[in-house]
C-alpha cells in the first residue's frame, strides 16, 4: 500500500468476542455463529442488555469467546432458562443458544412449550445432524442415509425412525418468527445474520 493511500477497515472482530482461539472441531459452524451473534448484538446496540443461555454441550464453549453475561444451563434447558430470565428482566435481549441434540432431543419439551407460549426470546439452534460432542452419534435430525458413529450404514427410517423437523413441528403455532439458514457459504452466513437481526 502506498503511503498516500488511505486504509479503510472493512471487517473487524466484534468487541464482544474476546478469545482468539477456539475449542470447536474443524469445520464446525459454532465459531461462525458466535461471530454473527456478537456482530448482530452490537449492531442492535444491545451489548449491555444481551443475556445468552447455553448448555453443557458444544455451545458452552461460547462462554470462553463471548464477552456477555452468559448463563450456563443443564443440557437441553437453555430455552426454559431464557424464558425465566426474560420474565424477570423484560428489558433484556435474551437468547437460548444450543445444538440440535439439546433442542430437539433432551430439550424437546422446552423447545415445544416455549413455542406454544410464544416466549419473547431468541432461540438459535445449530443443527449439524449428529450429537457432535459425544462422538458423532445419530441424532433426531440425522438425515436418511447419513452415516454416523451409531448408524454406520446410514440412517434407515424403517428401523431408526424419521427425521425431526422443527419447522413442521412448530411452524403452525402462533409464534412471532421462525427461520432456517445454512452457514455453509458466505451468502448463507449473510442470510443467517439478517435473520438474527
Predicted regions mapped to residue ranges:
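Short, Lys/Arg-enriched N-terminal segments with co-localized hydrophobic residues
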Residues: 1-8
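Thiamine diphosphate
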Residues: 58-132, 194
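General beta-strand structural signal in soluble alpha/beta enzymes
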Residues: 51-55, 96, 123-126, 178-182
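Glycine-rich ThDP/TPP pyrophosphate-binding loop and its adjacent helix/strand module
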Residues: 106-117, 126, 130-197
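Active-site diphosphate/adenylate-binding microenvironment
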Residues: 8-74
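Electropositive phosphate-/nucleotide-binding environments in soluble metabolic enzymes
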Residues: 15, 22, 27-34, 72-75, ...
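Structural signal for hydrophobic packing residues in well-ordered secondary-structure cores
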Residues: 41-48, 60, 89, 161, ...
Amino acid at each position: 500500500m502506498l503511503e498516500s493511500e488511505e486504509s479503510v477497515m472493512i471487517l473487524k472482530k466484534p468487541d464482544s468476542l474476546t478469545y482468539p482461539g477456539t475449542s470447536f472441531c474443524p469445520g464446525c459452524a459454532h465459531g461462525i455463529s458466535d461471530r454473527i451473534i456478537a456482530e448482530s448484538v452490537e449492531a442492535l446496540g444491545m451489548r449491555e442488555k444481551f443475556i445468552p443461555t447455553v448448555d453443557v454441550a458444544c455451545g458452552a464453549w461460547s462462554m470462553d469467546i463471548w464477552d456477555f453475561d452468559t448463563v450456563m444451563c443443564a443440557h437441553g434447558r437453555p430455552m426454559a432458562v431464557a424464558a425465566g430470565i426474560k420474565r424477570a428482566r423484560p428489558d433484556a435481549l435474551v437468547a437460548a443458544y444450543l445444538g440440535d441434540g439439546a433442542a430437539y432431543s433432551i430439550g424437546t419439551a422446552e423447545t415445544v412449550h416455549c413455542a406454544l407460549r410464544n416466549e419473547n426470546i431468541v432461540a438459535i439452534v445449530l443443527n449439524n445432524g449428529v450429537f457432535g460432542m459425544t462422538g458423532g452419534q445419530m441424532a433426531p435430525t440425522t438425515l436418511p442415509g447419513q452415516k454416523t458413529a451409531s448408524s454406520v450404514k446410514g440412517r434407515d427410517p424403517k428401523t431408526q425412525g424419521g427425521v425431526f423437523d422443527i419447522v413442521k413441528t412448530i411452524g403452525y403455532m402462533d409464534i412471532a418468527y421462525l427461520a432456517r439458514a445454512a452457514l455453509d457459504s458466505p451468502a448463507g452466513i449473510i442470510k443467517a445474520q439478517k435473520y438474527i437481526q
